[in-house]
């Protein structure tokens, strides 16, 4: 369904000054929460995964970045979320890092953002002079998208070009372990004629929700790194005493390197590394509640229950399986 951009524009224009100030305050807080460029890149990867993309491409061309995915196209509701802000978010709340809020982290590296999906094209740019320029959509002609392109994001980088390039070439192939649909991630630098390709392949093993997953990294078609993991996917029933939302189950993925299991652990909130060093021991990913800037796990009943449940699984069932 196409988005009604004109209606969205009218609604934003009708916002009173007090609400405008609240929205701007929330946007400033989000800019602080998502202050690191690598988080913005991870948000774009996660958003692509959430819409079922198998292939994601980051293309640097001069001072512009394009991000292309082949998942589901934007719905009208998606456009509305992009053009709105939940002003109830505050520093002490459990931040909703879902599509719409996390996406606004892109304004940390670009003040000129365009989105093309389906028959719609919109642009947000600071030079418009609007107080709510980060959520006010300007209609632009949609691109003639190729068959393998569902959604294209375009960003003008300003002085952040080098920082973005450094983050992109430093993406670890291990993040693919925790994505549901993305199988390949390409970073293409047109100016320097360099291409980085991260790929994931998997095959089922004996046992429920267990796969042997291979992730590899190639630079200009030459493989530079390849690793194998046994990945266990486990759904845990959430006791009412720690339940945060309406969900009665939560999913956790445990990745064990085939090269061997040791006692060190890295904890991820989805694809964000929160604790632990890269490539040490096993890795686990789940809906952990983190500090605002992802640098630690909050000390609360939810995290205690989830960690105890996962580590209990690792110490019993998982270790027994890896000995077989």
Identify the function of each model-found stretch.
Residues 1-148, 152-162:
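GHKL (Bergerat-fold) ATPase N-terminal catalytic module, capturing the glycine-rich phosphate-binding loop
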Residues 1, 110, 115-324:
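GHKL/Bergerat-fold ATPase module
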């Amino acid at each position: 369904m196409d988005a009604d951009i004109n209606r969205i524009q009218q609604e934003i224009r009708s916002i009173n000054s007090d609400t405008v100030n609240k929205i701007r305050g929330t946007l400033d807080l989000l800019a602080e929460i998502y202050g690191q460029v690598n988080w913005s890149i991870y948000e774009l990867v996660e958003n692509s995964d959430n819409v079922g993309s198998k292939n994601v491409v980051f293309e640097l061309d001069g001072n512009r970045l394009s991000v292309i995915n082949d998942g589901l196209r934007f719905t009208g509701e998606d456009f509305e979320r992009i053009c709105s802000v939940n002003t109830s978010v505050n520093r002490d709340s459990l931040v909703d890092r879902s599509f719409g809020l996390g996406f606004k982290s892109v304004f940390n590296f670009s003040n000129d953002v365009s989105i093309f999906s389906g028959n719609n094209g919109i642009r947000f740019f600071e030079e418009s002079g609007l107080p709510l320029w980060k959520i006010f959509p300007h209609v632009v002609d949609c691109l003639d998208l190729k068959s393998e392109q569902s959604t294209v994001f375009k960003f003008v980088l300003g002085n952040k070009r080098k920082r973005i390039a450094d983050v992109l070439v430093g993406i670890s192939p291990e993040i693919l372990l925790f994505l549901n649909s993305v199988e390949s991630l390409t970073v293409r630098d047109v100016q320097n004629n360099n291409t980085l390709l991260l790929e994931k392949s998997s095959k089922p093993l004996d046992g429920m929700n267990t796969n042997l997953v291979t992730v590899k990294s190639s630079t200009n078609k030459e493989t530079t790194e390849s690793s194998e993991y046994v990945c266990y996917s486990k759904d845990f029933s959430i006791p009412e005493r720690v339940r945060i939302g309406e969900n009665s189950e939560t999913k956790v993925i445990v990745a064990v390197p085939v090269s061997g299991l040791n006692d060190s652990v890295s904890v991820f909130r989805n694809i964000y590394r929160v604790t632990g060093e890269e490539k040490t021991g096993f890795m686990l990913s789940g809906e952990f509640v983190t500090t605002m800037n992802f640098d630690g796990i909050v000390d609360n009943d939810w995290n205690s229950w989830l960690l105890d449940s996962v580590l209990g699984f690792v110490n019993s069932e998982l270790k027994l399986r890896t000995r077989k």
